[in-house]
């Protein structure tokens, strides 16, 4: 059998093995060394193949697909710096838990460290960031197909969250003979080919037990913090906290409906602090909290008990509280820890949150990014989803908006980078094929500009709002030196996105008032399946200044009057 044909068989077994663990979407970049993997993916009828010319965007596309499906997604790239371009998406997957399998083609060992073209040291390139790593040998019939299948099965069984990096060296020739489908090497797997089960199956039965003190603790004064959790979990946590009578501090990604909106504006108020300091237990669901004041309160609170519930292992508590971490999903934990009917104990918080929300409405009565953040719920598509960018816009939405309970909200808030946001939102849209609203800043859009190509292929109305405040205006909120702030931090660019939209064949609109924005977005949801890029050219500092102003006003306000 020729080398090219056996390379194809080896790759065929790899891809088929991964489908037994739920793999359906695979993202492929162009490259020669990855030919065996690419052709194996193309030939596997179980797989939906996505392509992109930029490996950094491709990795984030896979991340978005994994976020929305909650299933493993694979990436195929060629050798060399193509592999390094996957680093940001791999890091994000490790922090937010999406299972992404990075299949990186490589030169064989004899071509490493000898000056061969496009050959770099790929083994261990991602250091400690993957949850699992496999460095496969060069394909050879001396290694049984059973070893290859069981090795991959074992890695997938261990991949509870995060990334799996599989480095796959292939020797030339890479092209030539068609694959031989029935050989002694593949026949060793027998009836596995006709099944849909893994070769090596592992059954995990995590025991979820009720905490021995729960009957006593649920009668105490508690506070619930909700970070990044799923839409279903957000609904369940909100109902659970309400039944207990415990105040719920919900992050923008909590999908709880934020029953106490604008918390990041009022958490520093002395009356609020005095009331919340009575909490005897604080229970945090999920992580990646956005608001600065919420993070400060979380770090400074000192209840008798502090519990964190998240399926991702690790502390997930930057406040380093003494307490307990439950590494399981919030839904599993809630089942084992039912609520009882208690009267609310922090009675003033509902009044404070309502007054603050009304004040935000009054202050943001002119067109700008603060108003858009506050009124964002009016722009959401029915039965759709929201993808939120990073930097300033997510903080404004977290502080000013109240999003519907259970409405799907996704973002890259693990490492919170501005790279790969357009490509991640494209993956989210492709996975669900639902109407999708993406909102992000101008620098984020410039950083990932070529990923607008991924928004050409859509399955439902797709709106991308770019809030253009001419640079990184989040830095105007920080005590950066005035003399250097503009040049070295904000970096104004004086660009707009009209020609970028035209380059990628996307519709473009630049409304200059709220009514025009609302009318445009509403028409998009009622129209055909296409992408509309909406650019909001806003005052450079209005959003940051409004946030700072409101924090100061609400912190100093006497809500007892």
Swiss-Prot record:
Pathway participation: Quinol/quinone metabolism; 1,4-dihydroxy-2-naphthoate biosynthesis; 1,4-dihydroxy-2-naphthoate from chorismate: step 2/7; Quinol/quinone metabolism; menaquinone biosynthesis
Cofactor or coenzyme needed: Mg(2+); Mn(2+); thiamine diphosphate
Cofactor binding notes: Binds 1 thiamine pyrophosphate per subunit.
Family in the record: Belongs to the TPP enzyme family. MenD subfamily.
Gene Ontology annotations of biological process type: menaquinone biosynthetic process
A GO MF label: thiamine pyrophosphate binding
Entry function: Catalyzes the thiamine diphosphate-dependent decarboxylation of 2-oxoglutarate and the subsequent addition of the resulting succinic semialdehyde-thiamine pyrophosphate anion to isochorismate to yield 2-succinyl-5-enolpyruvyl-6-hydroxy-3-cyclohexene-1-carboxylate (SEPHCHC).
InterPro entries: MenaQ_synth_MenD (IPR004433), MenD_middle (IPR032264), THDP-binding (IPR029061), Thiamin_PyroP_enz_TPP-bd_dom (IPR012001)
Listed EC numbers: 2.2.1.9
Subunit structure: Homodimer.
Gene name per UniProt: menD
Catalytic activity, as annotated: isochorismate + 2-oxoglutarate + H(+) = 5-enolpyruvoyl-6-hydroxy-2-succinyl-cyclohex-3-ene-1-carboxylate + CO2
Protein name per the record: 2-succinyl-5-enolpyruvyl-6-hydroxy-3-cyclohexene-1-carboxylate synthase
PANTHER family: 2-SUCCINYL-5-ENOLPYRUVYL-6-HYDROXY-3-CYCLOHEXENE-1-CARBOXYLATE SYNTHASE, PROTEIN PHYLLO, CHLOROPLASTIC
Keywords from the UniProt entry: Magnesium, Manganese, Menaquinone biosynthesis, Metal-binding, Thiamine pyrophosphate, Transferase
This protein's record includes keyword Endoplasmic reticulum: no
